Amino acid sequence: MIRTLEDSLRLVEGAGASNGGICFDTWHIVKLKIPYAELRRIPAQYITSVELNDGMFECPWSLHEDTVNHRRLCGEGEFDLKGFIVAMQAAGHRGPWGIEVLSEELRK
C-alpha cells in the first residue's frame, strides 16, 4: 500500500509513462494525515485529477466501513476542503475536479 506522497511520486516517476499521474482525493489525504502544505510541492505534471468529498476525522467503525459507506458531501463533514483546494491550485493543478462520495445513505 502506498502511504506517502514520496512513495506515490517515486512510483509515477519510475513508471515514466507520459499519461501517468496521481489522482488526489481529499478522503485519502486526510485519512493519511498528509499536511496540505505538502501538496503544494507536487509537480503539476503528476496531478491528473482531484476528487472532493468530506468526512469525519475520527469514526467508530472500521477504516474499510468508513471508506465505502460514510463519506459525505462537500461541506457536510469536518475536512478543510477550502484549504485542500487552495493547496492543489498552488501546486499548479488546472485539470479535472470531481466529486466522489461513497455513502450507504446516498445509495438508498
Task: Report the location of each language-model feature.
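Histidine-acidic metal/acid-base catalytic patches
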Residues: 2-24, 30-108
